[in-house]
Amino acid sequence: TFIGPLLVIKEDPSDGSAGEAAEPKVPLWQSIKQTLANKTFLIYMSSVATFFFGLQFFLGGLAFIAADMMHITEAQLGLMNAAAFAPIPIMLILFNLITKKWGAKVAFRAALLIFAVGMLLFPLTWDQLNIPVSPLIIGIIATGIGSFSIGAFFTIPYAFPAHIAAVDAEQTGKNRAGMFFAVQGVINQFMGSLAGAVLTMLLTWKFGVVAIGPFVALTMVLAFFLFKNYPLGKPTAKQS
């Protein structure tokens, strides 16, 4: 799956236009160093890596929350997942409206805080609290709140690196979009693995499953503040 596309990319155009208007090639190691030296990208990745850690932490722990804390069936867990994913098309429209009015930066930071709010509701689903509201209902509300953020999280890893790469290309004259996406992918894969390891350790604690929601909320708030100095993602100026 990786080698095939690479071979196609390396082929010369069939119309004989090879070499015409070709951009100067940047050596691999130099491209990596330039990518990691891009301050805007580092601000972006510090926040995205943190939120991705939290997101993977939650996704990995959701089954434990359902089984060990809420004591609900797989069918009921499916209802919670539906509450999270079914509204995403509408949430993407809302995310785009916020982006147009206040900019992608504000929209992303709002998504982080909204997801944190949803995560803070999950401890209330612990059936040992004997809250008069069903844990399933609270879980559906929590995941429903998080659906806005999930829709945004589908967009961010594609839109932001593309914008950063476009600005970088204007400044350097070299299009290295692929490297920005590659570095992001490697970092996020590492954070996903780290999230799984930390989750395993947390679940050894008696109340570890109850702490999953607040822990994820904390990572989202941290990502919110890490994104504060991101210089791009401002609203588009209205044309008179």
Describe each PLM feature range.
Residues 1-240:
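Membrane-embedded alpha-helical bundles of multi-pass transporters/translocases
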